[in-house]
A protein has these predicted regions:
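Glycine-rich flexible loops
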Residues: 1-175
Length: 175
C-alpha cells in the first residue's frame, strides 16, 4: 500500500489501523521498520495505564527509550492517532499505548524485532515484580551504560540471528 493506504496492485484492502505508520515515517526519517503488536504482557500492563519501568539488565535497551500514551484514543484509524503516536514517540524507539499494545521502531528490521521481543519481556518482568513488591530503580549510570552497550547494529544482528535460528528450528517448514 502507499501512504494513503491504497493497494499498489489494486487488489485487497489495507488495514485502516495502519494509517498512523506514514506519520511515524514522516516525522522520524531514521525509522525504516515499525512493529506494532498487542502481546499478552504488554497488553496486560497497558490495562493498568502505567508506564513501562526498566529496572533489569536484560531489558536495558529500552531504558529511557520507551514513551507512554496514558490515554487510549480508540481504534487508530484516523490521522489524529498518527499525530498522537508519532508525537508521543519523540526521540524514543518504543511506545506503550494504554489499553492497546506497543509500537517499536528501528533503523533496521533486526533492531525493531529485538525491541519488540524486549518490550514484551520487560512488561512480563514488570508485572511479575509488581506482584511480589515494589520495583526498585536501577542506577541511572549503569542502566545507561547497559542501554548503549546492547543498542548497537552488531548486537542487533547477532540477537536477531539467534531468534531467527530458534524460530526456524521450531518451524522448519516456514521456508
Amino acid at each position: 500500500v502507499n501512504q494513503d493506504l491504497e493497494p499498489l496492485n489494486q487488489e485487497g484492502m489495507a488495514n485502516p489501523a495502519n494509517r498512523f505508520h506514514p506519520w511515524i515515517y514522516k516525522e522520524h526519517p531514521e525509522v525504516n521498520c515499525i512493529i506494532h503488536t498487542h502481546p499478552t504482557h504488554v497488553a496486560a500492563l497497558s490495562m493498568l495505564q502505567i508506564p513501562l519501568m526498566i529496572s533489569q539488565m536484560d531489558v536495558c535497551a529500552l531504558y529511557k527509550d520507551c514513551s507512554f500514551v496514558g490515554h487510549w484514543p480508540g481504534v487508530p484509524v484516523g490521522n489524529e492517532e498518527g499525530i498522537l503516536i508519532s508525537s508521543a514517540l519523540g526521540k524514543n524507539r518504543a511506545v506503550l499505548l494504554s489499553h492497546h499494545g506497543q509500537l517499536v521502531t528501528g533503523k533496521t528490521i533486526e533492531e525493531a524485532c529485538n525491541l519488540a521481543l524486549l518490550i514484551e519481556r520487560a512488561a512480563q518482568l514488570q508485572l511479575l515484580a509488581m506482584s511480589a513488591g515494589q520495583i526498585q530503580p536501577i542506577p541511572h549510570d549503569l542502566a545507561t551504560e547497559a542501554h548503549d552497550w546492547v543498542s548497537t547494529d552488531k548486537r542487533n544482528k547477532v540477537n536477531f540471528a539467534y531468534y531467527a535460528r530458534k524460530a526456524l528450528k521450531k518451524h522448519s517448514d516456514c521456508i
